[in-house]
């Protein structure tokens, strides 16, 4: 997932180099923590009714149960989400980078912020009512087949009224996550604010 984002980022950064000046970018998207779990067999998947090799969205109850069960298993955690991955890439390449999203007041929300902080990203993370969103990836032996369970959680709570015009000022580019299409009112408001701030707008598909 991240490899594809970084290919896009390399091409994007090439376009934003202006002499000795590196452009700045603000992104908005679903703030999700990627959780990678290696499973010896598919018994875990069967327990949570996840067909092997599938990608499913799950509700809060199921998402929280899966995460509680995964915690002791030594899983790998990293801040993810399409736009967040792009912003991480631009930060790594030296662009001043910031990200707008919504998380829960929980361990995964704190991890998301600290993970972005290590790359120097300015995290504008609002607190939601629900628990933090997560993309859980299960890699099952013996053929390393991947199964996905996605819980969007607090990320879905981002609304137009959350957006502050001051956040958009001073950035050259504004990047929107394509997966936010389900939240059209928020996208429209974000585009209005970005245009008012003079940003060039990009959208991943």
Feature map (PLM): residue ranges:
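Low-complexity, intrinsically disordered or signal/transmembrane-proximal segments
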Residues: 2-6
